[in-house]
Structures are given as C-alpha cells and as structure tokens.
A protein has these predicted regions:
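C-terminal glycine/acidic-rich active-site capping loop/insertion
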Residues: 21, 29, 48-53, 82-163
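A general structural signal for well-ordered alpha-helical segments in protein cores
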Residues: 15-16, 139-144, 176
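C-terminal capping/lid region of NAD(P)-dependent oxidoreductase domains
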Residues: 181-194
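C-terminal hydrophobic helical "lid"/dimerization subdomain
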Residues: 170-183
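Short acidic/polar mixed-charge low-complexity motifs
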Residues: 26, 55-57, 66, 81-84, ...
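Predominantly a Rossmann-like dinucleotide-binding segment in NAD(P)-dependent oxidoreductases
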Residues: 1-41, 47-48, 95, 119, ...
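Glycine-rich phosphate/pyrophosphate-binding beta-alpha loops
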Residues: 13, 39, 62-71, 128-131
C-alpha cells in the first residue's frame, strides 16, 4: 500500500482547494486509487479520486505526474442544473460558461460581464497576460488588509477574506490522508473528518 503521497501532496491539494472554493462545498467522503506507474518510483505519481460533496453532488479528481503534454494542467469543470463552467490554468484568462439550452460563452478576465470579486482580482487591462505571479500579489494584498484591520481593531474588507486559511490547509492535509487511506483499502470510501 501507498504510505506517503508525493504527487498528491504537491498537485492534488490545489485541485481539492479549487473545487471546494469554486463550488462553496466541502467534501464529505472519497474513494481513491493512488498509484506508482513509473517503475522504481518510491512515491505515487498518479491518483484517481471519486468525491462525494456535502450536498450530495459527485465529483472526480485526477492528479498525475505521468501525463505527457500537460504543462501543469490544473483544470476545473463544474456542472450544475443551470450551467457548466470550465477553467484551465494553461489558459487562465478565460472561463467557459455553458448555460443549459444556450451556446457556450467564453468569459475573459477583465471583461464587462464579470462580478466584483473577479474584477477586484484583475490587476492589468484585459488582453495582457496575467495569472500566476498576480495570484500571489492578490494573496499578499488580502493578507496585508487582514493584518491592517486587526491592528486598527476594525473588520477587514469582506473580499480580503477569500484567501485560504490555516483551517483550509489542515483540511487539505486531512484530504490527502483520507485519499492515501482509501487507496490502501483498495479504493474503499473514507469519510473526511471535519
């Protein structure tokens, strides 16, 4: 059985956090197949995970270091009753929005149809590449706002509270441990502890 997780610690935690953040849902339980596909590797390099969210929604997560042609390849797809969303880190300025019964639309970063939170995260005019480094700048800005608010004994700007917390990090570690446990039990469903 897999006793530690290299691929999943470095890649899967990001996909896990992204799915929970975008949907606003926590994961209740999972069933995982964490494996070593490259002969001689001591730690995993591939994981397939089935997810059950707290509202009953289903999901799946694939995390791999053995998928040639993918440059990091972090991608999120969310489907609901009214629409689907698709985002890829390899094309971070675009969000594919597919309402049921309508043609899909591509929403661009900095475009007029975006809400306040998306506009706040945009640092440079649309048409210019933006993403990875600016994402860190947004985190630092929001953390600085929280620190300033605490020192001034005031409430921070609500938009600055969207940054990951220590609790989010702890939940990510629990997610990894549950996936490793599930895989060691041949993909049995494991309940995530709160």
């Amino acid at each position: 059985p897999v006793s530690a997780s290299a691929n999943f610690y470095s890649l899967g935690t990001h996909a896990h956090k992204l799915a929970c953040f975008v949907t606003g849902l926590g994961i209740r339980e999972l069933a995982a197949d964490v494996s070593r596909l490259v002969p001689g590797r001591k730690l995993d390099d591939n994981a397939h995970i089935l997810l059950r969210f707290e509202n009953g929604a289903r999901g799946m997560l694939w995390s791999s270091q053995v998928a040639p042609g993918n440059e990091n390849g972090l991608r999120l797809r969310v489907y609901g009753e009214k629409a689907g969303l698709e985002w890829s880190q390899e094309h971070p300025n675009q969000l594919r929005f597919s309402p049921v019964g309508q043609p899909p639309r591509v929403l661009s970063r900095g475009g007029p149809s975006l809400g306040p939170a998306a506009s706040r995260a945009t640092r440079i005019p649309s048409g210019h590449p933006e993403g990875y480094l600016e994402g860190f700048a947004n985190l630092y800005r929001d953390l600085a706002e929280q620190i300033r608010a605490r020192r001034a004994k005031r409430k921070p700007d609500p938009a600055a509270l969207l940054v990951p917390t220590v609790e989010d990090g702890a939940h990510g570690v629990k997610f990894i441990h549950a996936a490793v446990e599930s895989s060691a039990k041949n993909g049995a469903w494991v309940v995530l502890t709160a």
